[in-house]
A protein has these predicted regions:
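A generic structural motif
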Residues: 9, 33, 63-66
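Beta-strand/loop nucleic-acid-binding surfaces
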Residues: 23-36
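OB-fold/S1-family single-stranded nucleic acid-binding modules
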Residues: 50-66
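Short nucleic-acid-contacting surface segments enriched for D/E, G, S/T with interspersed K/R
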Residues: 33-46
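Conserved positions in beta-strands of structured domains
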Residues: 6, 18, 48-50, 60
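Short aromatic-glycine-enriched beta-strand elements
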Residues: 11-17
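Structural detector for short beta-strands of small beta-barrel domains
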Residues: 1-10
Length: 66
């Protein structure tokens, strides 16, 4: 799926991606591909949607689009 990072907290290591379908997906910095732990809001990304904690869907395998 494609989307855009709409929020990210360096301090907490968590953020949100708004998918192309308009759904907001939570993510933890460990889900960013390539070993980096930070990503800027506004970055266009590709990601997978996986079942997460508390029954919500979350973003995984997050890769910035070039």
């Amino acid at each position: 799926m494609t989307g855009r990072v709409t929020a990210f907290s360096d301090k907490r290591g968590v953020g949100e991606i708004t998918g192309a379908d308009g759904t907001v997906y939570w993510f933890h910095c460990t889900r960013i591909a390539g070993g980096t732990r930070v990503i800027d809001p506004g970055t266009d990304v590709e990601f997978e949607v996986v079942p997460g904690h508390r029954g919500r869907w979350e973003a995984d395998a997050i890769t910035p689009r070039s």
